[in-house]
Amino acid sequence: SGPIASKNEVLDEVAPSLPEDYSLPENAPIEPIGVVTALVENSVIIKATISGEFRVLKDQSVLCFEDRTILGPLFETFGKLQNPVYRVKFNSTEEFEKFKDCKGKAVYYVVPDSNFIYTDSIK
C-alpha cells in the first residue's frame, strides 16, 4: 500500500501534463525564457535568462526548445524575482529520460499557450 504519510506531509505532487493530442501550432510564436541548468528527480531545471522583476511565467505555461520540440508545461517557479528558476516535472522516468541530454539547451515559451503573473501582484 506504499509508505505511511503523516497528516501534514506533502506527497509527491503529480505534474501537470499536456493533452495527448497537443501539438505546437506551426505558426505559434515562441520566445526565449532560459537555459536548462540541471536535471534532477524527474525534473528539468531552467534558469531564466530574462529577469522576473516585472513578470514571471505562470504554472502550466507550455515550454519547448528552439527546434519546437515540446518540453512540457511549467510545474513551478522558484528563486529570486531577478533570477527566477523554472521547473518542468515529469510523472515517469521514461518521459524524463527523453530529455537527459538537454543540459545547456535554450528553452522557449509558446506565446499563445503561456501566461504571466505580473510581479506587482505577488511582491
Language model features: what each stretch is:
Residues 25-97, 101-104:
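Short beta-strand/strand-turn micro-motif
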Residues 2-8, 64-71, 116:
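Proteins with a high burden of low-complexity, intrinsically disordered sequence enriched in S/T/G/P/A and R
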Residues 94-123:
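Helix-rich interaction surfaces within compact, conserved domain-sized segments
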Residues 1-30, 123:
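Long, compositionally biased charged/polar stretches
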